[in-house]
């Protein structure tokens, strides 16, 4: 199933359950396919594609409704664990976020690059991986919705401490 003409690079841009932020006035979900606490910034993801697309067949792993990238094979439908694990096993490179795929790669002993924004590799990561951690915010931030982790995963935009991508990495 995973045979391609070039070696496979997996680019996981979003992951985990996505609970949309609710508009407090209407009670309706805000249409925003990006969760700043977990998702790889779009600019970084596209620059990875631009750099590696000549040498690799890039498969973007994202959730339904996640942002799209130019020049990738997009996987945004639910796959079985066997399908996901086999894709990890046959891939040549993996650029991931803190999600199940980085744990799978570690279980297979496959060094990967993992982006960390709202979580920490000290808690959830592996020394095997090349862990890229977001910079700490320069200003104090009221984390009113966060009680389990430094930041909640449900896209609390009111907690986002970064004004631009340059502030993050």
What residue ranges belong to the model's regions?
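Short acidic/His/Gly/Ser-rich catalytic and metal-binding motifs that mark active-site loops
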Residues: 17-27, 67-70, 140-143
């Amino acid at each position: 199933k995973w045979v391609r003409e070039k070696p496979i690079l997996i680019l996981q841009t979003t992951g985990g359950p996505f609970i949309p932020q609710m508009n407090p006035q209407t009670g309706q979900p805000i249409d925003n396919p990006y969760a700043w606490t977990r998702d790889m910034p779009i600019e970084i993801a596209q620059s990875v594609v631009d750099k590696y697309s000549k040498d690799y067949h890039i498969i973007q792993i994202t959730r339904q409704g996640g942002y799209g990238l130019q020049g990738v094979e997009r996987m945004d439908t639910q796959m079985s664990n066997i399908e996901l694990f086999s894709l990890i096993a046959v891939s040549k490179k993996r650029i991931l976020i803190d999600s199940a795929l980085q744990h799978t790669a570690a279980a297979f002993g496959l060094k990967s690059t993992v982006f960390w924004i709202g979580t920490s590799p000290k808690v959830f990561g592996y020394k095997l991986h090349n862990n890229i951690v977001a910079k700490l915010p320069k200003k104090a931030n009221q984390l009113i919705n966060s009680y389990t982790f430094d930041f909640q995963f449900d896209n609390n935009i009111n907690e986002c401490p970064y004004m631009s991508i340059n502030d993050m990495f």
